[in-house]
């Protein structure tokens, strides 16, 4: 299963190239390395214990990126819309996790702003992506932010809208009033009918999670004002997408499918930010949920925003001549953890030394205060990263060096009391480690972090060297021995028995002359023919 899923995801970048090549002229694109698939999955799994409001979600403004100025030559209107939607789905498959979309009412249907793309076609594209990635191996969170044009709140007619929604049953949502058909509330009906309730995390779901103590604050404590972890969102609730309205055109209540704009913090334009340089500043920023910045970015600036704890919404204007730059921009933002080209377990092996390139180190560069993750030999001896059990954003580096296998094992840990062997789970936590090293004037260094693929190659897990891969069943040698021993003993016993029977004659055959004499004696008592 893991191999099949990997093969599908490795085609993402090639598909992206083919989709654009079909739609645009003078286009060239090289596919990304397979390590990108492993890197994004490992990064998602590391963040699984973080609450969803603290995740770095890289997004795009659909109107500015795909609609404005995009004219596909030799295509009619319908073909152009179809190509744009294919590009959008490919971008989602490449790792984009947030979409900002303008919605307006035009020609008696709801459409994506400044386009002829029907809003339900946009939603069906999102649904296709959700269906295609709805496995534990590929699933991830998606945020869709809607801007409903203010002049679009009172259009339409019941008959027109009923035809447009393809038979949507309003009785499925109790708070809809049929007399209101044609206003902005219709958008919620479209979302319900085209996405499906099972994928959507709604305000009602949040209330339920808070009532059941499934939500946490930034300290990891149960909170009625918190959000669920990514793990709970994806694997317990089995949800995939949140919808939020950035305008105020729709009525809001806890039975709605959409969150209102008060749940998030969205800045636009050239916003000057400064990265937190202390634990108190990191804590203060963490108290702001869903931190988005919508702007035109460069490769360097978009990565800077992510490293400082923000989620960028890319609003660069593209056309058919420069749209290929978008992938480079998204790649710069998506991967806040790994070095480019990592993780790689294909290091050259030396038969004279013990080598196992399945463990990850935190590589710090002092001259620019940057860091990334890199796969190293598990037998190398390094210091390790230790996180305080109670204090937020509090990290230290161990005094002792050891191999990865022995750094934190059943025999004990090299981390001091009150600290656990750990790994940065978000960009802000990574920034906290960088600040710790910077304030101590640390030189370039490499330290072990709690991430490895020892059990299954390229399945990156936390929890020390004995952690197992959640996507593939792995049997240890000890369990395998316990399972195979009874069967082996039984088989050996049967083999011995069969061998003995083949080698030893039956007792009655030991004296063949006596056997023949007995047969002759019995034959005398037999009559020939029929007795008179």
UniProtKB/Swiss-Prot annotation:
Segments on the Cytoplasmic face: 509-532
Subcellular location per the Swiss-Prot or TrEMBL entry: Membrane
Transmembrane portions of the chain: 488-508
InterPro entries in the cross-refs: Telomere_Capping_Maintenance
Alphabetical GO biological process terms: cellular response to hydrostatic pressure
Residues bearing attached sugar chains per UniProt: 26, 114, 151, 163, 169, 211, 253, 260, 322, 328, 368, 441, 479
Pfam family, one: TIM-barrel_MTC6
Main location: membrane
Domain of life the protein comes from: Eukaryota
Coiled coil: none
Keywords per UniProt: Glycoprotein, Membrane, Signal, Transmembrane, Transmembrane helix
Membrane topology of this protein: Single-pass type I membrane protein
Key word Kinase present: no
Extracellular side: 24-487
Span of the signal peptide: 1-23
GO cellular component: endoplasmic reticulum membrane
Family under the similarity heading: Belongs to the MTC6 family.
Protein's UniProt name: Maintenance of telomere capping protein 6
């Amino acid at each position: 299963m893991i191999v099949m899923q990997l093969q599908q995801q490795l085609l993402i970048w090639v598909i992206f190239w083919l989709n654009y090549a079909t739609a645009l002229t003078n286009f060239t694109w090289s596919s990304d390395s397979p390590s990108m698939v492993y890197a994004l999955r490992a990064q998602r799994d590391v963040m699984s214990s973080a609450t969803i409001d603290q995740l770095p979600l890289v997004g795009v403004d659909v109107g500015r990126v795909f609609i404005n100025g995009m004219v596909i030559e030799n295509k009619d209107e319908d073909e152009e819309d179809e190509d744009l939607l294919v590009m959008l789905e490919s971008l989602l498959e490449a790792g984009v996790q947030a979409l900002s979309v303008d919605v307006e009412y035009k020609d008696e249907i709801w459409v994506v702003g400044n386009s002829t793309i029907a809003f339900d076609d946009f939603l069906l594209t999102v649904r296709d992506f959700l269906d295609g990635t709805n496995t534990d191996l590929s699933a991830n969170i998606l945020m869709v932010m809607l801007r409903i044009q203010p002049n679009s709140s009172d259009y339409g007619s019941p008959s027109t809208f009923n035809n447009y929604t393809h038979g949507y049953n309003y009785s499925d949502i109790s708070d809809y009033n049929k007399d209101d058909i044609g206003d902005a509330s219709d958008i919620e009906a479209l979302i319900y009918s085209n996405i499906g309730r099972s994928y959507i995390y709604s305000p009602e779901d949040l209330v339920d999670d808070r009532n059941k103590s499934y939500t946490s604050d930034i300290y990891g404590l149960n909170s009625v004002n918190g959000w669920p972890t990514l793990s709970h969102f994806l694997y317990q609730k089995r949800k995939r997408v949140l919808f939020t309205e950035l305008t105020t055109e729709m009525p809001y209540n806890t039975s709605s499918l959409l969150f209102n704009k008060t749940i998030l913090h969205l800045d636009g334009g050239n916003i000057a930010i400064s990265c937190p340089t202390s634990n108190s500043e990191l804590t203060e920023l963490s108290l702001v949920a869903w931190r988005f910045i919508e702007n035109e970015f460069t490769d360097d600036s978009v990565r800077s925003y992510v490293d400082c704890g923000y989620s960028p919404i890319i609003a660069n204007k593209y056309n058919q001549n420069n749209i290929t730059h978008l992938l480079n921009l998204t790649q710069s933002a998506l991967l806040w953890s790994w070095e480019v080209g990592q993780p790689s377990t294909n290091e050259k092996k030396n038969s004279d030394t013990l080598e196992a390139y399945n463990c990850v180190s935190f590589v710090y560069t002092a001259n620019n205060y940057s860091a990334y993750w890199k796969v190293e030999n598990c037998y190398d001896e390094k210091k390790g990263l230790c996180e305080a059990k109670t204090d937020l954003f509090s990290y230290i580096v161990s005094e002792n060096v050891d191999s990865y296998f022995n750094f934190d094992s059943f025999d004990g840990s090299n981390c001091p009391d009150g600290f656990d062997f750990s790994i940065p789970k978000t960009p802000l936590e990574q920034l906290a480690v960088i600040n710790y090293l910077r304030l101590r004037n640390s030189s370039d260094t490499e330290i072990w972090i709690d991430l490895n693929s020892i059990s299954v190659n390229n399945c990156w897990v936390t929890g020390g060297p004995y952690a197992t891969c959640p996507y593939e069943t792995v049997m240890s040698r000890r369990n395998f021995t316990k399972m195979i021993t009874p069967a082996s003993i039984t088989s050996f016993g049967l083999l011995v028995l069969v061998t003995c029977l083949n080698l030893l004659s039956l007792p009655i055959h030991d004296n063949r002359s006596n056997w023949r004499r007995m047969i002759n004696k019995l034959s005398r008592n037999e009559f020939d023919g029929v007795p008179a």
